[in-house]
Design a protein with these regions (language model features):
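N-terminal presequence-like segments and the immediate start of the first folded domain
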Residues: 9-99, 103-108, 113-116, 122-175
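Sec-dependent signal peptide recognition
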Residues: 1-8
Length: 175
């Protein structure tokens, strides 16, 4: 299988730190234990020296060399019975969304550390001061040393006005 490179344009909405550029002639460091582990499981998550460091705890590139690719549809804050969890409670909705993503990747035979890409769609009705909640919750699920690639988009609204966030994911599960 040919490697697939996913290059993600960063959207630094989840933090206020400033990106740092690497020196052009900087020596390359040996891969971290997490990077070696990810590579052994058919996915290499990394940040090229030629790009600005991410400011919001995600990887710029996910290289897939082998494994079963699983695409998870956008998840909203519905429980297994189809009831909305956390009406008007952004944190509760984010938590339920991540529980749904976890259930989906586990149903496919993997775990949350197999997730290599997260796409967030957040309703503009959410107070911007609440956006860091997404990262707080996310960090309790992902490998923060090698976080998935991510894109965060503010949308006018989701299909139903009571839905505050929707997240879709891509996972690569070792065969």
């Amino acid at each position: 299988m040919n490697p697939v490179l996913l290059l993600i344009l960063p959207l630094a909405l989840l933090t206020s730190s400033t990106p740092q550029n690497n020196a052009p002639n900087q020596k390359k460091e040996a891969p971290s234990m997490q990077e070696r582990t990810a590579r052994q499981s058919s996915v290499r998550l990394f940040n090229p020296d030629t790009m600005a460091k991410p400011t919001a705890g995600y990887s710029q590139v996910a290289e897939v060399t082998d494994g079963k690719v699983v695409y998870i549809a956008g998840q909203i804050a519905l429980d297994a019975a189809g009831n909305l969890v956390g009406k008007d409670d952004f944190r509760a909705q984010v938590k339920q969304v991540f529980e749904n993503l976890k259930a989906a990747v586990e149903a496919a035979g993997g775990n949350f550390h197999d997730v290599i890409k997260l796409n967030y769609f957040c309703a503009e009705s959410v107070d911007p001061s609440q956006i860091p909640v997404v990262r707080e919750v996310r960090d309790s699920y992902v490998n923060t040393a090698n976080p998935p690639t991510s894109t965060f988009v503010i949308v006018k609204r989701l299909v139903r006005p009571e839905w505050l966030i929707e997240v879709e994911a891509v996972a690569v599960i070792k065969k």
